Design a protein with these regions (language model features):
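Active-site hotspot residues in diverse enzymes, especially metal/ion-binding acidic/histidine motifs
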Residues: 1-154
């Protein structure tokens, strides 16, 4: 650890997870995605060491805030988000979850206001799968299982 208590030198094999994500059940989905996201960085770096920029990431300021549903501007982060979501939520698990929770083959809109029953079923599905609502909605969009996502209005 550096002399600054908020900066850590990362060796490329260490995952730094915020302590508040560790024990609280309401952060379980976010914690699981954070770990999957960091695993995705490692996979991408090992597959594409010359093209992937992990070697430049040696310091992490854990106070950096990240707003939910933010627009992705960093290609490496987008790749890790996408692969992390696929690791955490394989297509067959998402489709089976949609069946179990009565969401059909596809959702037209994800909205607490416009379709509260489906929204509640979606929330139960996210909890069941150990994913955050944001990650599950992102993955469903990737898979073409969600047409309009009002959870993260862009």
């Amino acid at each position: 650890m550096d002399s600054n208590p908020f900066l850590y030198h990362l060796d490329g094999r260490t995952v730094l997870v915020e302590q508040r994500l560790d024990n609280l059940p309401r952060f379980r989905g976010r914690r699981n995605f954070t770990i999957a996201h960091e695993i995705a960085h490692q996979i991408l770096y090992r597959l594409f060491p010359d093209a992937y920029g992990m070697q430049r990431r040696t310091l992490c300021d854990y106070r950096r805030s990240s707003k939910p549903c933010k627009q992705i501007t960093d290609w490496a982060e987008w790749q890790a988000d996408t692969l992390g979501a696929a690791i955490l939520l394989p297509e067959d698990a998402v489709q089976e979850g949609m069946f179990i929770f009565g969401l059909g083959d596809q959702m037209t809109v994800l909205s607490k206001k416009y379709s509260p029953n489906k929204f509640e079923a979606f929330c139960r599905m996210a909890d069941f799968l150990g994913a955050s609502r944001t990650t599950l909605s992102f993955r469903m969009e990737q898979l073409g299982l969600l047409e309009r996502n009002l959870l993260c209005a862009r």
